[in-house]
Amino acid sequence: MKVISSIQELRDQLRGQNRTAFVPTMGNLHEGHLSLMRLARQHGDPVVASIFVNRLQFGPNEDFDKYPRTLQDDIEKLQKENVYVLFAPTERDMYPEPQEYRVQPPDDLGGILEGEFRPGFFTGVCTVVAKLMACVQPRVAVFGKKDYQQLMIVRRMCQQLALPVDIVAAETVRDTDGLALSSRNRYLSDAERSEAPELARTLQRVRERVLAGERDLGKLEQDARTHLAGRGWAPDYISIRRRANLIAPNAAELDAGEPLVVLAAAKLGATRLIDNLEI
């Protein structure tokens, strides 16, 4: 595996490749990330991964400086997955001058849910993903359903900007107790780690109630928030939305069996966890 930081060297290395499969990450890799590499290999060759902690998607009170950087360990994991190139640019490589041009998603998708609680987050995501796509020029790129809203925004961005890349969605990888794998799980204390799977269990109960025919989605969402708050969580949102566009469904859509997803974000202690479950 070649480890490359220069954009020009990356382009030289990939010249002539027309089936490249790309997996962008911020590093601190876990089994969830590695499953993306394996899925990428099913859709293209060679597989290219990137590791870049993108300052643009961190808010002023978020953990950019504390975000775990484990490059050597990540390199060893990617080598075992037969990744062809790891693109690991420095901030100077990616942003040699101030990044004045940004890619901003529409408010109806980028300003809700995560976008409401993390203003500017998806602008940072779209800007760096578009730039990485321009550098790697993949045929396919793999994103996890764990970040459901991000997946949808990136897919729509590629469609609307006519980027010649297919976005492949990867299922969420969970620990044996149901907790979705995340780099932020390492911040949990032992007691918090024992409690953390309750987020997934809460979403499962919401899913079951919707499938059983409950139609008062507002009450379902409020019950779930109240349940978590009673266990010491601080929920930002628990929301049932249409899978197609993350708009709240109306009664007719519910009766017609519109595919739905329930999404959640909540703090447990100092750690903010997100999860979702398709209905």
UniProtKB/Swiss-Prot annotation:
Binding-site list for (R)-pantoate: Q57, Q150
Residue positions of the active site: H33
Domain of life: Bacteria
Any one of the GO BP annotations: pantothenate biosynthetic process
Enzyme class: ligase
Family matches, as Pfam families: Pantoate_ligase
GO molecular function: ATP binding; pantoate-beta-alanine ligase activity
CDD domains: PanC
The keyword ATP-binding is annotated on this UniProt entry: yes
Matches recorded under InterPro entries: Cyt_trans-like, Pantoate_ligase, Pantoate_ligase_C, Rossmann-like_a/b/a_fold
Major location category of this protein: cytoplasm
Catalytic activity, reaction form: (R)-pantoate + beta-alanine + ATP = (R)-pantothenate + AMP + diphosphate + H(+)
Keywords: ATP-binding, Cytoplasm, Ligase, Nucleotide-binding, Pantothenate biosynthesis
Residues at which beta-alanine binds: Q57
Assembly mode: Homodimer.
Listed HAMAP family: PanC
Stated family: Belongs to the pantothenate synthetase family.
Name of the protein: Pantothenate synthetase
Phylogenetic classification of the source organism: Bacteria, Pseudomonadati, Pseudomonadota, Betaproteobacteria, Burkholderiales
Gene this protein is translated from: panC
